C-alpha cells in the first residue's frame, strides 16, 4: 500500500502543489495588473486613478472581485446556454495552462518538455476558440462581429509570430524553452542584434494576439459596444477579464524567454549572476507589461483594414525575408546549431 502511494499518488500530489504554487500568484498578479493599469494610465493622463479603497487604492482589485462575484449572472433568452457558460471558462483555463512550460529560473519549471515551443504555440492558438464560442452562443450581432474579427486577427498575426519563432529556433537549435534561454548565455552579440527587429515584430504581434490597443478591434467600444463579451455579466465577464490579463502576462513571459534571455541577467553581465534569476525574469516581464499599459494610454485604435494590411502586407513578407536572411548568415558563418 505504501509503495502504491509513493509510486502513483505522491507524484500527483507534488504536481498539484506545483500547479497551485504557479496559479495562485498568477491570479494575484492578474488582479493587481488591473490596478497597475488604472494607476499608470491615470498618471499619464494627469489624474490619480483608484485611491479610495484601502491605502493608495491597493484594495480596489478585491473590491472589484467582490462586486462581480455578487452580481446577477444574466443569460440571454435565445442564447446557447451551455456554450455561453463554457466560453469564459475555456478562455481563462487556456490562459493558465500555457504557464506549464515557462521557466521562471534555472530548473524552476512545471514541465520541462522538449517541445515546449510547439506546446505554447498550440495553447496561444486555441485561446481564440473561447472568444468565437462566446460570440456565437450570445446570439448578438455585436458579439458575433467581435468574434469574427478576433479569429481573423488571430490568423493574420499567428503566421508572422510563427515565422519569428523560427528565426529564434534557427539560432538556438532547440524547441525546449530552458535550452533556448541557456543558448542565449553564449550567443554572439551580432546574432542578438540580428534578432532585435524580430523581437519588435513579435511584441507587436502579441499585442494583436491579446486584443490590446492599438489592436482591440474585437471589443471596439465605439463600434461594437463591447464586442464578444457584450452579453456577459458577473463571473462570466470576470473570467474573460482575467483571461485577457493572464494572456498579457503569458505573452510577456514568452517575449522574455525568446528575446530577453529569460532569467539570465541583462547583457549576460557576470557580476549580476549573484542576483537570483527569478528576479530578472519578473523584472523583464514587468517592463514588457508596462509597455502594454504605456501603449494603451498613448496610441489610438487602428482601423480594421490597417490592421489586416500590417499583418499580411508588412509583417508576413518581412518575417519571411528575415528567416531566409538569418538562415543564410548562419550557414555562411558556420554558426548553424546542431539539432
From Swiss-Prot:
It is an enzyme of class 7 (translocase). The keyword Transmembrane applies. PANTHER family: NADH DEHYDROGENASE SUBUNIT 1, NADH-UBIQUINONE OXIDOREDUCTASE CHAIN 1. It is a multi-pass membrane protein. Its main location: membrane. NDH-1 shuttles electrons from NADH, via FMN and iron-sulfur (Fe-S) centers, to quinones in the respiratory chain. The immediate electron acceptor for the enzyme in this species is believed to be ubiquinone. Couples the redox reaction to proton translocation (for every two electrons transferred, four hydrogen ions are translocated across the cytoplasmic membrane), and thus conserves the redox energy in a proton gradient. This subunit may bind ubiquinone. PROSITE patterns: COMPLEX1_ND1_1 (PS00667), COMPLEX1_ND1_2 (PS00668). The chain crosses the membrane at residues 9-29, 50-70, 82-102, 115-135, 161-181, 187-207, 235-255, 275-295, 311-331. Belongs to the complex I subunit 1 family. The keyword Hydrolase does not apply. The lineage of its organism: Bacteria, Pseudomonadati, Pseudomonadota, Alphaproteobacteria, Rickettsiales. GO terms for molecular function: NADH dehydrogenase activity; oxidoreductase activity, acting on NAD(P)H, quinone or similar compound as acceptor; quinone binding. This is NADH-quinone oxidoreductase subunit H. It comes from the Bacteria. It catalyses: a quinone + NADH + 5 H(+)(in) = a quinol + NAD(+) + 4 H(+)(out). It is found in: Cell inner membrane. One of its GO terms (cellular component) is plasma membrane. InterPro entries: NADH_UbQ_OxRdtase_su1/FPO, NADH_UbQ_OxRdtase_su1_CS. Pfam families: NADHdh.
Amino acid at each position: 500500500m505504501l509503495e502504491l502511494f509513493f509510486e502513483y499518488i505522491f507524484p500527483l500530489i507534488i504536481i498539484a502543489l506545483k500547479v497551485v504554487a504557479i496559479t495562485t500568484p498568477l491570479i494575484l498578479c492578474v488582479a493587481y495588473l488591473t490596478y497597475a493599469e488604472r494607476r499608470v494610465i491615470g498618471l499619464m493622463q494627469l489624474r490619480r486613478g483608484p485611491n479610495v479603497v484601502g491605502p493608495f487604492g491597493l484594495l480596489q482589485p478585491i473590491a472589484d472581485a467582490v462586486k462581480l462575484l455578487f452580481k446577477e449572472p444574466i443569460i440571454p433568452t435565445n442564447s446557447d446556454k451551455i456554450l455561453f457558460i463554457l466560453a469564459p471558462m475555456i478562455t481563462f483555463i487556456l490562459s493558465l495552462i500555457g504557464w506549464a512550460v515557462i521557466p521562471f529560473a534555472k530548473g524552476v519549471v512545471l514541465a520541462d518538455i522538449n517541445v515546449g515551443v510547439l506546446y505554447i504555440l498550440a495553447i496561444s492558438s486555441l485561446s481564440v476558440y473561447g472568444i468565437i464560442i462566446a460570440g456565437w452562443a450570445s446570439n448578438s450581432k455585436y458579439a458575433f462581429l467581435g468574434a469574427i474579427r478576433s479569429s481573423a486577427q488571430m490568423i493574420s498575426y499567428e503566421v508572422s509570430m510563427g515565422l519569428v519563432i523560427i528565426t529564434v529556433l534557427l539560432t538556438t537549435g532547440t524547441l525546449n524553452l530552458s535550452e533556448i534561454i541557456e543558448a542565449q548565455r553564449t550567443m554572439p552579440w551580432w546574432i542578438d542584434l540580428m534578432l532585435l527587429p524580430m523581437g519588435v515584430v513579435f511584441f507587436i504581434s502579441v499585442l494583436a494576439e491579446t486584443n490590446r490597443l492599438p489592436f482591440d478591434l474585437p471589443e471596439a467600444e465605439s463600434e461594437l459596444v463591447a464586442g464578444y463579451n457584450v452579453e456577459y455579466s458577473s463571473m462570466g465577464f470576470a473570467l474573460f477579464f482575467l483571461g485577457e490579463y493572464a494572456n498579457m502576462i503569458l505573452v510577456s513571459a514568452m517575449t522574455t524567454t525568446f528575446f530577453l534571455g529569460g532569467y539570465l541577467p541583462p547583457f549576460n553581465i557576470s557580476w549580476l549572476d549573484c542576483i537570483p534569476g527569478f528576479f530578472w525574469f519578473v523584472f523583464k516581464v514587468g517592463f514588457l507589461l508596462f509597455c502594454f499599459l504605456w501603449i494603451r494610454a498613448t496610441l489610438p485604435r487602428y482601423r480594421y483594414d490597417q490592421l489586416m494590411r500590417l499583418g499580411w502586407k508588412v509583417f508576413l513578407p518581412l518575417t519571411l525575408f528575415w528567416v531566409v536572411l538569418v538562415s543564410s548568415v548562419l550557414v555562411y558563418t558556420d554558426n548553424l546549431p546542431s539539432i
